């Protein structure tokens, strides 16, 4: 079980009232998808969603990058400074360029890259993922977008993503690196994720 005390020890920089909003839906969602069945699963889940959401401080992807940030994080989409400077500090334009034309999104000009940018505790991204969730949750795409930004929706979407991507199996195998890749697409933030995982194991053991 996740308690407010546990979340405060794991994410001490986050305000208690913010963390408290997530305690009940976290336990309900994680319980529904068998994440609370073992300490290993529960610790991995809280470490991963905690990292993805900046310690539960945001449920929508922050794409407010400077030109330098764009060159570093998205070199494939911003190969030179001139282009990066045209997009810097404009999250909508950045999302449409980076996510447009892939993951089920239409081209950059459709605006779907921004509409289906990362949301929820696990940063669900792309129209394909949104559509799959909307189908399973029996809601429209627009309802899905709004739901992901609520505490309840943020928790249930994360636990749902965990389930459909068979992440409990990776937890049971102890493969934290592959688990991170399934969520992040790479290993960005692996050290922080691992730190919170080990701490959660210690606190929940």
What positions do the PLM features span?
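Low-complexity, Gly/Ser/Thr/Pro-rich intrinsically disordered linker/tail segments
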Residues: 182-205
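Surface-exposed helix-capping loop/turn segments at secondary-structure junctions
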Residues: 33-36, 166-173
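Ligand-binding pocket segment of bilobal, Venus flytrap-like solute-binding proteins
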Residues: 157, 162, 166, 182
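Alpha-helical scaffolds flanking conserved acidic
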Residues: 1, 38-47, 174-179
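Peptidoglycan-targeting cell-wall enzymes and recognition modules
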Residues: 2-21, 50-160
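N-terminal carbohydrate-binding/catalytic regions of secreted carbohydrate-active enzymes
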Residues: 10-44
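Extracellular/periplasmic catalytic domains that process cell-envelope and extracellular macromolecules
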Residues: 36-41, 114-117, 150, 174-175
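Acidic helix/loop microenvironments that form the catalytic cleft of cell-wall polysaccharide enzymes
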Residues: 49-52, 172-189
């Amino acid at each position: 079980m996740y308690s407010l005390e546990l979340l405060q020890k794991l994410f001490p920089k986050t305000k208690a009232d913010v963390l408290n909003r997530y305690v009940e839906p976290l336990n309900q969602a994680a319980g529904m998808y068998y994440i609370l069945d073992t300490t290993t699963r529960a610790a991995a889940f809280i470490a991963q969603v905690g990292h993805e959401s900046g310690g539960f401080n945001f449920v929508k992807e922050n794409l407010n990058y400077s030109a330098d940030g764009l060159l570093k994080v998205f070199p494939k989409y911003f190969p030179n400074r001139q282009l990066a400077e045209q997009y810097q500090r404009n999250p909508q334009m950045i999302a449409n360029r980076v996510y447009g034309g892939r993951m089920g999104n239409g081209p950059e000009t459709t605006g779907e890259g921004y509409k289906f940018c990362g949301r929820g505790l696990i940063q669900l991204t792309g129209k394909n993922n949104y559509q799959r969730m909307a189908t399973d949750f029996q809601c429209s795409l627009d309802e899905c977008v709004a739901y992901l930004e609520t505490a309840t929706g943020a928790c249930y979407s994360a636990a749902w993503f965990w389930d459909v991507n068979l992440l409990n199996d990776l937890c049971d195998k102890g493969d934290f690196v592959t688990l991170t890749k399934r969520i992040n697409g790479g290993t960005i933030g692996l050290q922080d994720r691992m730190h919170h995982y080990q701490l959660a194991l210690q606190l929940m053991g």
